Each structure stands twice: as C-alpha cells, then as structure tokens.
Amino acid sequence: MDLALLHPDFVRTARRVSRPLAQAMDAVGPPDWPSRHQQPLARYLARVVVGQQLSTRAASTIWGRVEALGKAEQQSIPALALNLPDATLLACGLSAGKLKTLKALAEADAAGVLKRQRLARLEPAARAIELTALRGIGPWTADMLALFYFRDPDIWPLGDLAVRKTLERFLVTQSRYDLSSAAALFAPHRSVLALYM
C-alpha cells in the first residue's frame, strides 16, 4: 500500500472531520509504516510483552538483557523462558507475570499456535480471538500485532490511549463526529489513520 498516494485522500477526509486534523495531517505528510514481520512472531510478541506498561528506556534495557541472555545461552526468545531457571530471567528485570506470559508464548509457539502463515490467513477479528486466548495477550497487543506485524489495513485500535487522545484533540466540541464515527470515515484504511496519530 503506497501511503504517499493515499495521503491526499486522507487530508480531504480529515477536512470533513475537522480543519485542524486536516492541517496536521498535511503538515506531517504520509506516515511511515514499519514492517516487523521479518522476525519470528513469538519473538515479536515476547518483545511487546516485555515492554508493556514500561517507559521506552526501561523496556529497552530489560529487552537488551533478555536478548543478551538468549545469545549467551544459545536460546531463542521466548523458548528460553522454559529452558532457564526463573531466577535467571527475573534477574533481567522481568516481572513474575511477564515471565509467565513468556512461558505461555513459548508453549504456544512449540505447539504451532503462533505460525505466522496460518495466522496471516485469518481475518483480524478471528486472529485477535486466538491471540487473546493466550495468557498475557489482550486486545491492545492483538491490535498492535495486526497493525505492525501483519499490517492489516483496517485496524482501529480503540484501546490505544495515544491514538484515542490524539484524535480526540482534533475533534472540535461542535463536531458531529465522535471517535468511532470519525475513524469510520477512513475505512477501509483505518490502520493508516492510526499511524497518523
């Protein structure tokens, strides 16, 4: 999907929602949409879980320790959660809850639940149901996976506070649109709207 080609249409649609939104989109230009699917899905999910509810700096530090441990022990992530002592992983800065989630991801990966090709064929809603059945994976994580790993074109992550707050800022008080109805104007490319936010 060429975001540069979509950009003028997005600005026009944004103008229907609010002039400040259109001006902001026009000023920033087409967003980047980084692809994360080069790495194994289980590893990507592990990285997301490790970073949840932490500052970027803390998440990066802890993930760096986990990566270094995996390299030193010649263990893949998250499989190392099943193969190394809990104390070793907790010493990296992981919480007990995140360690349990990494173990669940490793088990799911070993069972074939996290096969990228299989999950990619599912509709995003069906995929989200499967993923949120895993320990520690909630709707926000499923949405981020749909956006950045699978690059589904029409994901509107209502659970993402930054996305919601940014769009709310542009909805003027007299606007006839609320968050959902404003986002609906951008279907079937609401993922791109989320990237602008």
Q: Model-predicted segments: where are they?
A:
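Alpha-helical ds-nucleic-acid-binding substructure associated with the helix-hairpin-helix region
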Residues: P8-R12, A22-Q23, L54-A133, L185-A187
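Short secondary-structure boundary/capping segments within folded domains
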Residues: P34-Q39, Q53-S55
